From Swiss-Prot:
<dbReference type="GO" id="GO:0006412">
    <property type="term" value="P:translation"/>
</dbReference>
<dbReference type="Pfam" id="PF01196">
    <property type="entry name" value="Ribosomal_L17"/>
</dbReference>
<dbReference type="InterPro" id="IPR047859">
    <property type="entry name" value="Ribosomal_bL17_CS"/>
</dbReference>
<keyword id="KW-0689">Ribosomal protein</keyword>
<keyword id="KW-0687">Ribonucleoprotein</keyword>
<dbReference type="InterPro" id="IPR000456">
    <property type="entry name" value="Ribosomal_bL17"/>
</dbReference>
<comment type="similarity">
    <text>Belongs to the bacterial ribosomal protein bL17 family.</text>
</comment>
<dbReference type="InterPro" id="IPR036373">
    <property type="entry name" value="Ribosomal_bL17_sf"/>
</dbReference>
<dbReference type="GO" id="GO:0022625">
    <property type="term" value="C:cytosolic large ribosomal subunit"/>
</dbReference>
<dbReference type="GO" id="GO:0003735">
    <property type="term" value="F:structural constituent of ribosome"/>
</dbReference>
<comment type="subunit">
    <text>Part of the 50S ribosomal subunit. Contacts protein L32.</text>
</comment>
<protein>
    <recommendedName>
        <fullName>Large ribosomal subunit protein bL17</fullName>
    </recommendedName>
</protein>
C-alpha cells in the first residue's frame, strides 16, 4: 500500500534526488524556464513554490532557510529580491508545466517548467518551442 507516501522516487537515491531538485531549482530561478522530464518537473513544482512563498516575507531567517535548501547565493538573492516581490500578491501557482512531446532516445515525456509572468526575453518562448517539437 502507498498510503501517506509523498513524492516520486525518480529511480535515484534520496541524496541524489535532493541534490537534483536543488540544482534544478537553481537553474529554474536563474533561467526562469527549463526543459526536463515530466515527472521531474512535477516534483520540482512544489519544491520551488515553497521557496517563493517563504521569500514573500524577506528577513534573515527566511534567507537562511532558502539558502539551506539551495546552495547558490545568486539564486537565493534572485528568489528573495526579484521573485518574492514579483509574486507578492499572487497566492500560489507561481509555475506552469507545459508538456512538450517525448524524448527521441527513450520516449520519456518531456516538459518545460517556467515561472508564470516570467521575463519572456530571458529565454525562448515555450509555446513556440513546444509546437516546433510536435511538428518535427
Amino acid at each position: 500500500m502507498r498510503h501517506r507516501i509523498k513524492g516520486r522516487r525518480l529511480n535515484v537515491t534520496s541524496s541524489h534526488r535532493q541534490s537534483m531538485l536543488a540544482n534544478m531549482a537553481v537553474s529554474l530561478v536563474i533561467h526562469e524556464q527549463i526543459k526536463t522530464t515530466l515527472p521531474k518537473a512535477k516534483e520540482l513544482r512544489p519544491y520551488i513554490e515553497a521557496l517563493i512563498t517563504k521569500a514573500k516575507k524577506p528577513d534573515l531567517a527566511v534567507r537562511r532557510s532558502v539558502l539551506s535548501k539551495i546552495k547558490d547565493k545568486r539564486a537565493v538573492e534572485k528568489i528573495i529580491n526579484i521573485l518574492g516581490v514579483r509574486y507578492k500578491d499572487r497566492p500560489g501557482g507561481y509555475t506552469r508545466i507545459v508538456k512538450s512531446g517525448f524524448r527521441y532516445g527513450d520516449l520519456a515525456p518531456i516538459a518545460y517548467i517556467e515561472f508564470v509572468d516570467r521575463d519572456i526575453n530571458a529565454k525562448g518562448n515555450v509555446h513556440q518551442d513546444a509546437n516546433e517539437e510536435i511538428k518535427n
